[in-house]
């Protein structure tokens, strides 16, 4: 079974945060202007924790009981799903948090698994999505093979 993600849109910063379901609702604080987080101690996040889950691309911190690093995406308002290209993904996710049925869980899981994580891992930066990682995770930084310019591309 794939990991279940809780998606939170911060309209003030235009950032979409992805966290596993069950994590603290506020997540971990992200100090600094670029959201950099100091490295975690090895005892805080076991390297094999959650390795059996099938959703590729999530760092080990996503499955930590101590709470995950937020996977933060800039330009979130421009991110669209391939299933419903006319819809804006953050709005769709926000409606789901309000209990409104606008996209099935299967569609959401397929989007994140096949369109985001797989393409970023195998193809590098996917320009079609117009989404860039901001700050990165202290356990895994999703980056294109070319020099990273995520901080200037948003």
UniProtKB/Swiss-Prot annotation:
Coiled coil: none annotated. InterPro entries: Transactivation_prot_X. A fraction may be phosphorylated in insect cells and HepG2 cells, a human hepatoblastoma cell line. Phosphorylated in vitro by host protein kinase C or mitogen-activated protein kinase. N-acetylated in insect cells. Its main location: host cell. It is found in: Host cytoplasm; Host nucleus; Host mitochondrion. Pfam families: X. GO terms for biological process: DNA-templated transcription; symbiont-mediated activation of host NF-kappaB cascade; symbiont-mediated arrest of host cell cycle during G2/M transition; viral genome replication. The keyword Transcription regulation applies. One of its GO terms (cellular component) is host cell nucleus. Keywords: Activation of host NF-kappa-B by virus, Activator, Apoptosis, Host cytoplasm, Host G2/M cell cycle arrest by virus, Host mitochondrion, Host nucleus, Host-virus interaction, Modulation of host cell cycle by virus, Transcription, Transcription regulation. The keyword Transcription regulation applies. Residues 68-117 are annotated as: Mitochondrial targeting sequence. May form homodimer. May interact with host CEBPA, CFLAR, CREB1, DDB1, E4F1, HBXIP, HSPD1/HSP60, NFKBIA, POLR2E and SMAD4. Interacts with host SMC5-SMC6 complex and induces its degradation. Interacts with host TRPC4AP; leading to prevent ubiquitination of TRPC4AP. Interacts with host PLSCR1; this interaction promotes ubiquitination and degradation of HBx and impairs HBx-mediated cell proliferation. Multifunctional protein that plays a role in silencing host antiviral defenses and promoting viral transcription. Does not seem to be essential for HBV infection. May be directly involved in development of cirrhosis and liver cancer (hepatocellular carcinoma). Most of cytosolic activities involve modulation of cytosolic calcium. The effect on apoptosis is controversial depending on the cell types in which the studies have been conducted. May induce apoptosis by localizing in mitochondria and causing loss of mitochondrial membrane potential. Belongs to the orthohepadnavirus protein X family. This is Protein X. It comes from Hepatitis B virus genotype B1 (isolate Japan/Yamagata-2/1998) (HBV-B).
């Amino acid at each position: 079974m794939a990991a279940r993600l809780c998606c939170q849109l911060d309209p003030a910063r235009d950032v979409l945060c992805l966290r596993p379901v069950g994590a603290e609702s506020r997540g971990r604080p992200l100090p600094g202007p670029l959201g950099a987080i100091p490295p975690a101690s090895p005892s805080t996040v076991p390297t094999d924790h959650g390795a059996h889950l099938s959703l590729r691309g999530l760092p080990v911190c996503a499955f930590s009981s101590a709470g995950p690093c937020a996977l933060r995406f800039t330009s979130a308002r421009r991110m669209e799903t391939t299933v419903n290209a006319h819809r804006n993904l953050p709005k769709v996710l926000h409606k789901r948090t309000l209990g409104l049925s606008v996209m099935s869980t299967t569609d959401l899981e397929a989007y994140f698994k096949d369109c985001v994580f797989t393409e970023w891992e195998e193809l590098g930066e996917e320009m079609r999505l117009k989404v860039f990682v901001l700050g990165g995770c202290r356990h895994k930084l999703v980056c294109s093979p070319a020099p990273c310019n995520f901080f200037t591309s948003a």
